[in-house]
Amino acid sequence: MIKKNYLGFVIILIAFILDRVSKILIINHSNTFGKLDMSLNPFLNLNLIWNEGIAFGLFSFDEKNYYNLLTFLIIGIILVLLWLMFRSSGLEKLGFASVIGGSLGNVTDRIFYSSVPDFIDLNYNGFHWFVFNVADIFITLGVMILIFCEFKKKEK
């Protein structure tokens, strides 16, 4: 089982490590220099916010019971995705691994910080997209790969 899923585990580990390192750097910078709000170019800012919801701040709760329930639900979904990754192959396995790696990064923050640090702020002509993090990038890419794989299955 390990040999068959080796690449999947490598992708999970890469996603998790890149996410953790980026968040540690951003949080340390913010703790050292105060609020982080830095423009890197006309389209990209670094702006640390703490997200108590899920992707893009959705389902943010003040009630701790709902927050804990949501965290356990996310852990359950990660376990289901891991099971699906074991049963998949090829590009689909990479899609599941990418989603799992990003999800593990975000759920780790939920457990240790009770929120997820988001800091990548894309904008164009004053329109700002939702602030996100490296884990969200891996989750999004993984979902895109899985959607692509589903379309390829339907063509056959």
What are these regions (language model features)?
Residues 1-156:
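Alpha-helical transmembrane bundles and membrane-interface segments of multipass inner-membrane proteins
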